[in-house]
Every structure is written in structure tokens, then in C-alpha cells.
Amino acid sequence: MKTAYLASLVLIVSTAYVIRLIAILPFFHTQAGTEKDTKDGVNLLKIRKSSKKPLKIFVFLGSGGHTGEMIRLLENYQDLLLGKSIVYLGYSDEASRQRFAHFIKKFGHCKVKYYEFMKAREVKATLLQSVKTIIGTLVQSFVHVVRIRFAMCGSPHLFLLNGPGTCCIISFWLKIMELLLPLLGSSHIVYVESLARINTPSLTGKILYWVVDEFIVQWQELRDNYLPRSKWFGILV
């Protein structure tokens, strides 16, 4: 009898979590787009602009071209993203951090908090080296993500990602938190695919397409031929 009760309890809990998982993964309930979406910053980035509280935004910088694209995106939408905002800046190399620090000086009203993330995988790394760095990144990023996510509670917030594989780990932890702590609500993860990806998505894009709340591409061909659930607003960076 006790075994039957335990089995029933496990079944109920498992079913509840499966339903919750379906609810938090937008892929299951987002329709494919067929036309160009309206280039409206509020709709594009899923921000409740009417809120009186300052926006809390997490931005992750990759390196090189990814950093350049993210900075241009922030600059193009500065009125929406950088107006009296609190910016949580994740980075994996010092050059990107310095570049962002120089850029953000123009917006003295923004508060910035910096978080260094290990790279999920180094270029030309062996399989063993990749496994080692991925495990280290998982542990370190978990601490950062939990701290940042709880700091955002009660305020309009956004996780804006672009580029490297570390974005997958960050998104993974955010969705785990949504699954286990439903009262936290949505993390509002937006991934912007690189301008360089015209016909096929990046490896990071292929993974995050199934996970993030909003997946944005910058070329119609990519949306129409490969990623029908994505949004296309034209060139953003």
C-alpha cells in the first residue's frame, strides 16, 4: 500500500513538472512568423516600459565581433535599455570588459555590476580540455546566475544574449530556476543571432532556439528557411 501511495506521488509530481517544463519553454506555444515583425523596441525586447522601476538588464559579452554587435545593439536601443538602468555585465575576457566600460561612460546614470564567466570552450581545445572547462563554467555560472536572478526580482528585467556557448549555460540555469521556482516568473531571455549568420544558425543558436523566450535573427532567409519560430526585425546592429 505504501508503495502504491509513493508511486502515485511520484507520478503526480513528475506530471506537474512536465507540464511546468512545457509552460516555460516558449517553443511549445510560439507560432511561426511569416512576415517581418514590427521594429518596436518594447515588443522586440519584451520589456514592460510602463513600469516605474528601473530596468535590470543582464548583458553577456563574448569576444571580438560578438562584443561589437552587443555594444551596437545597446547603442541603437539606448533609450530603452540604458535609461536609468541597472546593468549586470557578464564577460569572459578582459578586453571586452574594458571596451564596455569605455562605452558605458556615456551613460553616467546607469549602474553597472561586472561578473566574469569562464569560457565554456576555448578555440582548438581538446575534448578533455573542453569537458574540464565546461564543468568549471557550469559551477561558476550557477553562482552568478542565481545571484543576478534574485537581484532582479520585483523589477522589469531582461537577459540579453548574443554569440558564445556560455550563453547556453546561462540559459540552462535560468530555465532550471524557472522550473523549480515558479514564483520567480519568466527570466525574459532574448537571444540575438549574429549578423554573420545569413543562411544557417550558429551552434549556440541551434541550441538556444528551443529554450529562449525570444529568438531574433537579422536575415529573413534564416528565419524562413531554418528558424520559423524566430523573429525578424531587419538589421539591428
UniProtKB/Swiss-Prot annotation:
Gene name of the record = ALG14
According to UniProt, the name of this protein is UDP-N-acetylglucosamine transferase subunit ALG14
Outline the subunit composition: Heterodimer with ALG13 to form a functional enzyme.
Q: Name one Pfam family in it.
A: Alg14
Query: Which parts of the sequence lie on the Lumenal side of the lipid bilayer?
Result: 1-7
A molecular function (GO) term: protein-membrane adaptor activity
PANTHER family, A to Z: GLYCOSYL TRANSFERASE-RELATED (PTHR12154), UDP-N-ACETYLGLUCOSAMINE TRANSFERASE SUBUNIT ALG14 HOMOLOG (PTHR12154:SF4)
Principal place of residence: endoplasmic reticulum
Q: Report one GO cellular component.
A: nuclear membrane
| Source taxon at top rank | Eukaryota
Could you list which ranges are Cytoplasmic topological domains? 29-237
Keyword line: Endoplasmic reticulum, Membrane, Nucleus, Transmembrane, Transmembrane helix
User: Anything further noted?
Assistant: Present with 339 molecules/cell in log phase SD medium.
Functionally, this protein is described as follows:
Involved in protein N-glycosylation. Essential for the second step of the dolichol-linked oligosaccharide pathway. Anchors the catalytic subunit ALG13 to the ER.
Give the transmembrane region(s): 8-28
